UniProtKB/Swiss-Prot annotation:
Disulfide bonds: none annotated. Pfam families: CxxCxxCC. It comes from Shewanella amazonensis (strain ATCC BAA-1098 / SB2B). Belongs to the UPF0260 family. This is UPF0260 protein Sama_1927. Transmembrane segments: none annotated. InterPro entries: Puta_zinc/iron-chelating_dom, UCP006173.
Amino acid sequence: MEFWKTKRLEELNPEEWESLCDGCGKCCLNKIIDDETDELYYTNAACKLLDRDACHCRHYSERFTFVPGCAAITPDNIASLTWLPDSCAYVRLFQGRDLPSWHPLVTGSKEAMHAAGMSVKGKAVCETKVRYLEDHIVLWPLKDVD
């Protein structure tokens, strides 16, 4: 049986925890919070460390050195990371839902995720090329497809 169906998040070992990440890259997108409404908006401006084709961090093990504001996702803080998309495996499992049909642990590769449009592949730009984040607000990362 799949480990994510038999263990609680806090019971996962580091390898299992890391494997839950589908590598979509959505958590690496810059977000904006509206000052008046507190509404969260995603942009297509990705962290400078994100490889936008492979959808993974170029310096994952040193990311906190390069980007001090980068957030580590842990079982202890998942409830407070309200900016994570609903499609995030950590969020889904925290909410008592299963992994989606396109998840790499289910399919064996990232291709189904990319084909379902659930990653930032081909959709993001580097944050260093962006002048005004407000001009880069997008809606596509928010959908959740099973």
